[in-house]
Amino acid sequence: MKAIVTGISGQDGHYAARHLLARGFAVTGLTSDPDKIAGVQAEFGDQPVTIESFDYAAPRAIEAVIERVRPAVILNYAAKSTGTGMFDRAFEMARLNGAFVLDILEAIRAIDPTIGFCQASSAEMYGHVDTSPQDERTCFRPKSPYGAAKLYAHNLIGTYRNAYGLKCSSAILYNHESVRRTTHFVTRKIARAAAEISLARAASFSLGGLDALRDWGYAPEYAEAMVLMALSDKPADYVLATGTLTSVEQVCRICFEHVGLDFRDYLVIDPALQRPIETTNVCGDPSAIARDLGWRATTGIQDILVEMVDFDLQTLRGAPALGHTTC
């Protein structure tokens, strides 16, 4: 059995590949950065993984890859990320986060309609929320180019599933973290700061505020859910979430208490770091996927954050990094 994983050099692509390997798949992983190929390939050792450079901006180029590999499943994690500068990259975001999914769907329709395809959608599609928790029937009102492009792709998935009977599905992903996150994301930024300050490598850290609430889960578990969705004979869209909100302040407290410190002694609030257009306080209802596929998020936020801080402590002390590879 063969699988294609786009965005394999990212957090989710890595864990998805691990889950697929555990199920006996040979994986072709695509990355837009040729400089990452050797490093990503080395992480998988002698396992049946092939890493290839791919230009996601090239219209319909994915068709040739699918024709050559002939996968049983495809998982798409390729995306321009949310955050600062989104409006400056709106065209790129529309192409990669939206139109590229159309390329995949058209290729599947032409080559092999039995391919199982799971798309990484996002809770940022909800945007302005007035109900909580959100589920698969909650109205989407995105506030950003990222959310709008993801919603375009999400709607395409449903359209092609209904019109052509394709085995395609969308995972509406809420925030999901691991040691493979970059410090662009607030949980990793805080965990790294706790480790650095505890080792006297830094004196302070800055955040835009403490009040924001998020539904944070564990990335390896969410990758597993997407594999289950891609393999399902009854494709559907599902919310992947924990159903529990955690504040940025709680994240700070957990990380710093783990190293015996009070975060308030080191935090600098910088209003310039606030992101007013963000989707705020979204909390997902994962009951549908629990009912249909038996999947539930089981790793709590405290365990996730402690793993991150310990990873950074070891890295900063010069020990080998604690790469998370068990799936």
Locations of regions flagged by a protein language model:
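N-terminal Rossmann/SDR dinucleotide-binding element
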Residues: 1-73
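Amphipathic terminal alpha-helices
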Residues: 2, 300-327
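NAD(P)H-binding glycine-rich loop region in Rossmannoid oxidoreductase-like domains
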Residues: 56-96
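Conserved Rossmann-fold NAD(P)-dependent oxidoreductase catalytic core, especially the SDR/UDP-sugar
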Residues: 76, 102-145
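NAD(P)-dependent short-chain dehydrogenase/reductase
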Residues: 130-133, 155-230, 244-245, 252-259
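Active-site helix of classical SDR
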Residues: 145, 149-152
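Mid/C-terminal beta-alpha module of Rossmann-like enzyme folds, strongest
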Residues: 190, 228-275, 286
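Conserved C-terminal active-site "lid" loop/helix of NAD(P)H-dependent oxidoreductases
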Residues: 219, 271-296, 315
